[in-house]
Each structure stands twice: as C-alpha cells, then as structure tokens.
Amino acid sequence: VSSKVVSKALGLREASPASPEGARRHREQVVARATVRVVAERRTPRGTTRVVEAVAGPVMAAAGVDASNTGPDGGVLLLPEDPDAAAADLHARLVGLRPGTRVGVILTDTAGRAWRAGQVDLALGAHGLHVVDDLRGGTDVDGRPLAVTERALADELAAAADLVKGKLGGVAAALVRGLPEAVAPAGTTPGARSLVRTGPSDWFAVGHHEAVRAALGAPPGSVAAEEVGLAPVGPEPVEERGARAVRLAVLGHPGAGVTGSAGTGYAVHAPDPVTAGRVAARLEVALAGEDVGAAVHVAEHPGTGAPSQADRAPGSRPPLG
C-alpha cells in the first residue's frame, strides 16, 4: 500500500502558501519538523536539498515530504511518524473485514539509494510478515556456507509491487500472491524500521563533506553550515571550493584572516601565533574536505620578525573527498 494514500487518510497533508517563495520556505519548515538529523546537504537552483534521518525511520531526501500527487489543492504530504503502527492498524482492519485471512501489509514509499542512480519503492512500514529472509547458516549451490546474506524481503516486495502500481496511474495498492512463507502471525515479527541501519552498523551516518565540516564546527543543518556555504549538487570551480574552505577555517576565530587563492596558496593572518597555527591547521583540513590541493602557510607574525615554519606544500596529504 502506498504510504501516500495512508498519509492522506491520516490527515497528514499541509496546505502551502500560494507564492513560490512562501511554498519553498514552508516545505523547508515541514522537512525540518520531520527530521531527526541531517546526513548530507547540497545547494540546488531551487534551494537546499537535505538527506536526513526521518522521524518515520529511513534515511531519505527531504524526510519523505512530498508535493506530488497530493490532490487538486496542492500542499505537501508528510509520512506517518510510526509507519509500522500504521501498517498494523491497516492489517487489523483488513483481517476484521475477512476473518481468518492470512495477509501481510507493507507500506511503501519511494526513495533513492546510496551508490545507485534512480529511485525504487521500499518498505516504510510492515506488519504480519517476515521483513527479512535470513539465509545465514545455510549453504550456496556449491556447498559453501552463507555468513552474511539477509534478503530484505519487504523491500523486494515493495519494489515488485511498484511495477504494478506505477507512479502515474493513481493505483494505491497491489496484491502479491504466492509467498505464503513470507506471511507471519500478527505481532510476531519486527517491522520495517528494523531494516534501517543505526548506531555502529551505520557506516554512512553522515556525508564525507559534512563529517569534515562538523568536526570544524559547522554540522549539517546548522546556522554555521549555512554561513560557511553549502556545496552545490554539480561541479564547482576550485576557487569557490577554496573560498568555502577559508570561511570554514576562520569560523569561530575572530581576528583571523586568510589571503591568497587555490592557485597561489593561502596565507593565514591572526592576532597571535597560536591562533594563526590553529587556523592554518583547520584550513588544511577544510581544503582536503573540499578536495583542494593548495599550499597553506602562516604569514609573518607582527613583532616576531620571523617567518612561519608551518608551510605545507600542495599535495602533501591526500584529499578526503
């Protein structure tokens, strides 16, 4: 069942202002409310796109807030805060209509995937079925033991159902037959939230740019991140990436400044040698995070008469990006 029709039934639609700018700001506010944490963010011609951990569970763009197929009055739709509970409620209603029926319910939503282009439907919520087919402990066709393989059965069913439902025909649900082994007694199996990697199992809890920026005081989704500036979704000239690294390096260090360019190298100026060295080190990290290989040195500190010994040559350390 499409989560969109469930969201409509639950009254999770919000009207948007008529003006494009007002609608954009309203959508950003709605996304923020539906967000647990920001994973990655990029600048686009239409504003800022954020990949977030949604209150609904998965990591997805814009917390799953959607402005398509919302009805003639427009607005945006939010995902149910507890999709597994919504699936359980729908399951109970279906069984109530047909007592004795063995059925599993999957709430589906469309999302992108790391490492892959395009979008697919996945299981947002589930009840009354095994969401995973755990093959660990078995053997492959050659008799070798399987130690890792767990089929995300609920996601596979969600994607298969989308081949029938499609995106443009207004079909909200599909009935999948022929998998009796996937169905389980109500309340005996984990829901779709169990498919979301969290904690130590989440190797990609934050984007690589965002990890560097967060370490230097500008975590994703923060005012500081906006002040430093966000990377765009497409290619960007090296000088713009370098300028953003400079803004990040001097963040929280009043009186410090940087001159130079990505092509000629950067000189750090500060009221005292300690601050200068600190900002220079921050700049090296920030430049690596932007994949800019440029020399960094501390300018001669007033009153010392001595040049800095903190020079770094271009390419002295591999880029992080």
Listing of model-derived features with the role each one plays in the protein:
Residues 304-319:
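Cysteine-centric segments in proteins
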Residues 78-103, 107:
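Phosphate-interacting basic helix/loop segments used at nucleotide- and nucleic-acid interfaces
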